[in-house]
Amino acid sequence: MKASEEEYRLNFFIKNDFKRKICKSCKTPFWTRDEKKEYCSDIPCTDYYFFDINIKSQPLTVKEAREKFLSFFEKRGHTRISPKPVLARWRDDLYLTIASIVDFQPHVTSGLVPPPANPLVVSQPSIRLEDIDNVGITFGRHLTTFEMAAHHAFNYPDHYVYWKDETTAYATEFFTKELGIPEEELNFKESWWEGGGNAGPCLEVTVGGLELATLVFMQYKITDNGNYTPLKLKIVDTGYGVERIAWITQKTPSAFHAIYGNLVYKFFNKIGVAYIDETLLKVASRFAGKIDPDNPDTIKIHRQMVSKELGIDIKAVEEELDRAAKVFQILDHTKTIMLMLADGLVPSNSGEGYLGRLVIRRALKVLRLLKSDVRLYELVKEQIDFWKEDFPQVLKNKDYILDAVELEQQRFEKILEKVPSIASTLARKSEITTEDLIQVYDSNGIPPDLLEEELKKKSVKFELPRNFYALVAKRHQTSTIKSVYDKVKLPKDMLEYITALQPTEKLYYKDQYMRSFEGKVLGVYKNYLILDKTTFYPEGGGQLGDTGLIIDEKSSKRYEVIDTQKVNDVIVHILKEEPSTIKVGDNVRGEINWERRYRLMRHHTVTHVILAAAKKVLGEHVWQAGAEKTPEKGRLDITHHKTLTEEEVKLIENYANSVISDRRPVKPLEMNRMEAEMKYGVSIYEGGVPNSATIRLLEIKDWDIESCGGTHVSNTSEIGAVKIINVERIQDGVIRLEYVAGPALVDYIRETEAKIVEASKIIGSSPDQLTSRLRRLLNEIEEKNNLIIQYRRIIETELLNNLKPYEINGNKIYIIEGLGDEEENKEILRKLTSTDNTIAISISDNRLQIATSKNMRVDKIVEELLKGGGKGGGKGTFANVILNSKKSKEEIIEIVRKSL
């Protein structure tokens, strides 16, 4: 949508003598107080000339720039709020926090819940991977991690806060009064913003070639057919670049120097590469606005401009700038890695973990291209020491961060062993496409840059896309949201039937111990029954739906409820048979299977207990990746970067049982969504993100609080005790814990006792002597195995010394009948065929093992053998064959003769 000029013709501009100009280069309208200005002061229309602007502000570090911004707006009636994590775990459609507005999407921006303050100010650390391939090349214009300082105002129909004029006035005052940028250097470039289904006009604030801020006025909703409809809630969505504010005040050769200070020089030193000539860097940075990373020709032109300006050979310029760009990439990526892991990301092959691993592996690839032997965790450690005051969580989670990074490097080094074989496979293709490279990366984790080296050896050329990592990240940066209808186990016609029915009153929230109730029938469809109220809990949050009975009060007929499901707020009772005596309007009585429900309640509550215990033992990076509660056992999947040790499992179990024996109260709470987030953080969403203004929390006193809609015991003592019965790694970065509690634990103990008694009987021992008896048996078996090995060696030696070969056309053929197991045979055959022109065959009934010396081909013999029927095959000098019928030694020799 192209906004009209009137959208930007603000009273503020008119009153303060701003003139609307058209940029001579890009033809975009912009507002300025400099009547002589011809360009919009944005790149590529101009170079970075902010180096020459007299700015009154003292040089600001990132920390000082952040505080100056926050304090400025705090003094002007804005409430300072804490930033959210860089992992957008309050969203089910997005993995990373890419901007400050994400903090309030979708529930505040949709009007479902009020903002935490209005107006407010925040400095939100953000991560965007769409520019990952451009980092370093543009001297700091592109970063994967940055702080978006923002002030937001939410204008409701009945509550106006402020809009365009005030927002523009704030920007002008901040940049000219607080930073001391000359008023004539400040420009407001007209633009248009769209994102997250919303849109609106925006103004880009440019100074000396740098875009310092974007002022978005979110006022339209984009409909499914692409039309724009006005929003009732109009939002001021601003974004000021904290790092760019630091850069423009410091005027350092690159933004990296402004962001990282002395860490820049330390990284060059630790990585083991020479620091770049600073004069060259300053000139290159000034001309950097000419670089469009999507157009490689502009990079070449930029290098030529630097070469000409300094009178330096262009190859020397390219070498210096390429080396510096790689170090800048490592600086940027290690900070991103640090923030991701500090907020709980566990590297893996899916979800947010995939994106974390992508950044780690790109950093490792760059280190490899620089031929550096520094360990990546050493560089991340430097980042932690540098940023620990700004981001306390990085110091708190330091051990996990460094451990996870080192483990990822070890895995990456192991993966690189596959490069030659992967390159050989690719080399056989007539053309290597970008899709091929992405598939190789997704399947094997091998960066195309490293494949390129190997493919060059094979004289294979391919085009490496400059934005490869951005392409890969784009495929994985969002999560597919399942429709509510995709999550339920009901047929489509049933889903259509219930759309007109009113919400069901949830009696299980009023009293989780209610076993029976009376309700009115609102709907009957096949074997599905809908009531006005129910105490049957529908499947959700990993807890199975209740079972029980529905009793027709007229006929007293009892119908078995085999499952309970929910669609939106309508609860559906699934009966074993169609309720022939029940019709709409009837009154019925419901009785849940209480013993089953109580087991589910115990297993659900203990899941919360174990999750908090796992965090305590393993670290705050642990996050619930899935859960299931059945009457028989509970299951919890957690994110963790390595297999659990026995000691860690014991500690988790001990903490859980300690909480159970402490008799801690378990209390459900209902809170305003935003209030809950502000008070407890986004960890309340471990079990999922509810779509409601008010959310239900479960609090285990002084232990855990989490959003949960399940049914629970009211005190941890009701759980009885818990035992973790199984721990396994189910996928990369995810560990599964299975456990039993209460009566299920008693069942488990009885079953285990029965197995011990049975095992004792089998080996002729009593249960209390089972261990010692087993140990003796194993020692005896080991002794006998050693004896068997000795006898086999004697037989093998005797066989090799006395076995006479058949001679066929100068070839030796050894035939062995009915000897040992396959591995033993293979070793004997290998020894027999150690000299040229030798074939050895082991026969066991209709099974053959065939070996040949290196100068012969086993496949020809196999081919001849299979002519008579059978199956088998081999590779190189060894094969296995199963014939349809047993053949004599003489018949096999004849077949071999034919193959020769």
UniProtKB/Swiss-Prot annotation:
Cofactors that this protein relies on: Zn(2+)
GO biological process terms on file: alanyl-tRNA aminoacylation
Disulphide bonds in the chain: none
A Pfam entry, by short name: tRNA-synt_2c
Residues the entry annotates as binding Zn(2+): H604, H608, C708, H712
Cofactor, how bound (note): Binds 1 zinc ion per subunit.
E.C. code: 6.1.1.7
SUPFAM superfamilies listed in its UniProt record: Class II aaRS and biotin synthetases, Putative anticodon-binding domain of alanyl-tRNA synthetase (AlaRS), ThrRS/AlaRS common domain, Translation proteins
GO molecular function: alanine-tRNA ligase activity; aminoacyl-tRNA deacylase activity; ATP binding; tRNA binding; zinc ion binding
UniProtKB keywords: Aminoacyl-tRNA synthetase, ATP-binding, Cytoplasm, Ligase, Metal-binding, Nucleotide-binding, Protein biosynthesis, RNA-binding, tRNA-binding, Zinc
Location of the protein in the cell: Cytoplasm
PROSITE patterns the UniProt entry points to: AA_TRNA_LIGASE_II_ALA
Cellular component, GO, one term: cytoplasm
Catalytic reaction equation(s): tRNA(Ala) + L-alanine + ATP = L-alanyl-tRNA(Ala) + AMP + diphosphate
Domain of life (superkingdom): Archaea
Function in brief: Catalyzes the attachment of alanine to tRNA(Ala) in a two-step reaction: alanine is first activated by ATP to form Ala-AMP and then transferred to the acceptor end of tRNA(Ala). Also edits incorrectly charged Ser-tRNA(Ala) and Gly-tRNA(Ala) via its editing domain.
Annotated domain remarks: Consists of three domains; the N-terminal catalytic domain, the editing domain and the C-terminal C-Ala domain. The editing domain removes incorrectly charged amino acids, while the C-Ala domain, along with tRNA(Ala), serves as a bridge to cooperatively bring together the editing and aminoacylation centers thus stimulating deacylation of misacylated tRNAs.
Family assignment from sequence similarity: Belongs to the class-II aminoacyl-tRNA synthetase family.
HAMAP family noted in UniProt: Ala_tRNA_synth_A (MF_00036_A)
Protein name per Swiss-Prot or TrEMBL: Alanine--tRNA ligase
Species per Swiss-Prot/TrEMBL record: Saccharolobus islandicus (strain M.14.25 / Kamchatka #1)
Organismal lineage: Archaea, Thermoproteota, Thermoprotei, Sulfolobales, Sulfolobaceae
